[in-house]
Amino acid sequence: MRRPMVAGNWKMHGTRASVAELTQGLGNMLIPEGIEVAVFPPALFINEVIDGLKGKGITVGAQNSAVQPEQGALTGEVAPSQLAEVGCKFVLIGHSERRQVIGESEEVLNRKFAAAQKSGLTPVLCIGETLEEREAGKTLEVVGRQLSSVIDAFGIAAFANAVIAYEPVWAIGTGLTASPQQAQDVHAAIRKQLAAKDAEVAQNVQLLYGGSVKAANAAELFGMPDIDGGLIGGASLNADEFGAICRAAGN
């Protein structure tokens, strides 16, 4: 049975003071039994957050990592092996802001995916379509292509140690949210695509939904059969709101 997961992507938010306050609030949160909770702070604060959440049942991940697994001459980057050494468990790969704003290609994302796994991190592969692509009826084509890029490079077995987050680009930070049924339809298509290669991998992989998830809509989204939790943006910056989302996943 798949374990529900709630992941908080803090993006480029936080000061030392606000991160300390948020970390303390999360540490006081009651985690429902049987769910996995992870947070992804800015790289600058990863050590502080890991220290502050020790023994609290919350794991920590990174928002980005380098294309090579080991440390070396790559200015401005952080190696996944370095992230693993300090205690990170997960790393986001392919978030739409990395794809669109930074311009990361499928080739670069595949290298990051492989480097993360080689270093013992679990990649959270983010996929999703723009509003233009959805309105053109290309949602499943786009999501399928993004998923196939990894499958074609590394085989379906790569998803035995990975998480997939479907984040429609048009719903990230806009207040717009895919309806529970819209999200479920895409998640079901993702699982079907994986099952065509390996039914067991498809059955076991966690599929998260991201895109303006909040306490008010989390329960309905998480009640869908192929939605195993959420990748939360803005709402993860408030410990009370994030806690309510975690409780929704626990139910």
Swiss-Prot record:
Domain of life: Bacteria
UniProt: substrate binding residues: 9-11, 173, 212, 233-234
This protein's encoding gene: tpiA
Keywords: Cytoplasm, Gluconeogenesis, Glycolysis, Isomerase
Species name: Pseudomonas putida (strain W619)
Purpose: Involved in the gluconeogenesis. Catalyzes stereospecifically the conversion of dihydroxyacetone phosphate (DHAP) to D-glyceraldehyde-3-phosphate (G3P).
Pfam families: TIM
GO cellular component terms, semicolon-separated: cytosol
Enzymatic reactions: D-glyceraldehyde 3-phosphate = dihydroxyacetone phosphate
Gene Ontology MF terms in the entry: triose-phosphate isomerase activity
Protein name: Triosephosphate isomerase
EC assignment: 5.3.1.1
Pathway the protein contributes to: Carbohydrate biosynthesis; gluconeogenesis; Carbohydrate degradation; glycolysis; D-glyceraldehyde 3-phosphate from glycerone phosphate: step 1/1
Keyword check for Cytoplasm: yes
Catalytic machinery residues: 95, 167
InterPro entries, A to Z: Aldolase_TIM, TIM_sf, TrioseP_Isoase_bac/euk, Triosephosphate_isomerase, Triosephosphate_isomerase_AS
Major subcellular location class: cytoplasm
SUPFAM superfamilies, per the entry: Triosephosphate isomerase (TIM)
GO BP terms, alphabetized: gluconeogenesis; glyceraldehyde-3-phosphate biosynthetic process; glycerol catabolic process; glycolytic process
Record's subcellular location: Cytoplasm
Signal peptide stretch: none
Assembly information from the UniProt record: Homodimer.
Protein family membership: Belongs to the triosephosphate isomerase family.
